[in-house]
């Protein structure tokens, strides 16, 4: 029997990353990357106990050596599995400060976690996606998670917006380079507050004013399953009452 194809989710916590992992684990083996093993260990156990296959690897996406070690481990554990999808979803680099209070470390840390992290994951994932394009039912896919800050540099968000703008530019360049080679590179703008454990207590005037992480995961799966005739580069997701 042929080995099950693989999806890699970089940036897994109890919210959106977990929802993406559960969605893709319905079809693929999944590898979950996060710096803190406590972010993925319960999810790995959950997926494996319900008939899926998941492994977690402690990885700092901003560190090329850490990413290389993770991909080397993936190659050893899944030597004959094609890479169907890679999702870049780290939440690092979020700082809200007046510009004059920002430190150089604040600024560089945001760029490292988002721009450098996206570069490091793409550098290792794209060769595998290119190898897989003739052996899986859907186009090999690389999705980057963006934010409101990907297209709007708001006051007090100079470091995060700079990092997210850079990540979006990387995604667009890769889409133009690798799309003609059959790889679907996409950037998803998550424009609003996501309904995750740390935002549960946040109250809003309107019902359903927070993004549902399971619905975000459904949208990512939709991107992955789009045919080559109909690639979407960018997808905006926001609650119906979100001003934009």
Regions found by a protein language model. Give the residues of each.
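C-terminal helical subdomain
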Residues: 180-183, 187-195, 200-244
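Catalytic loop of short-chain dehydrogenase/reductase
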Residues: 92, 110, 130-166, 171-172, ...
């Amino acid at each position: 029997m042929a080995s099950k194809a693989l999806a890699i989710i970089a940036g897994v916590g109890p919210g959106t990353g977990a929802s993406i992992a559960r969605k893709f684990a319905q079809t693929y083996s999944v590898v979950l990357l996060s710096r803190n093993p406590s972010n993925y260990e319960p999810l790995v156990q959950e997926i494996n106990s319900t008939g899926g296959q998941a492994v977690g690897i402690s990885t700092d996406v901003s560190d090329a050596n850490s990413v290389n070690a993770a991909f080397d481990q993936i190659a050893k554990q899944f030597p004959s599995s094609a890479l169907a999808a890679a999702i870049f979803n780290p939440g690092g680099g979020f700082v809200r400060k007046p510009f004059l209070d920002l430190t150089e470390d604040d600024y560089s840390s945001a760029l490292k976690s988002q721009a450098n992290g996206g570069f490091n994951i793409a550098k290792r994932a794209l060769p595998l996606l290119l190898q897989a394009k003739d052996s899986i039912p859907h186009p090999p896919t690389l999705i980057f998670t963006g934010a409101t800050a990907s297209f709007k540099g708001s006051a007090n968000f100079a470091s995060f917006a700079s990092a997210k703008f850079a990540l979006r530019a990387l995604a667009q360049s890769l889409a133009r380079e690798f799309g003609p080679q059959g790889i679907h590179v996409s950037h998803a703008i998550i424009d609003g507050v996501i309904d995750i454990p740390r935002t549960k207590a946040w109250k809003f005037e309107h019902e359903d004013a927070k993004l549902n992480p399971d619905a975000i995961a459904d949208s990512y799966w939709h991107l992955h399953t789009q045919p080559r005739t109909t690639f979407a580069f960018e997808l905006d997701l926001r609650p119906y009452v979100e001003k934009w």
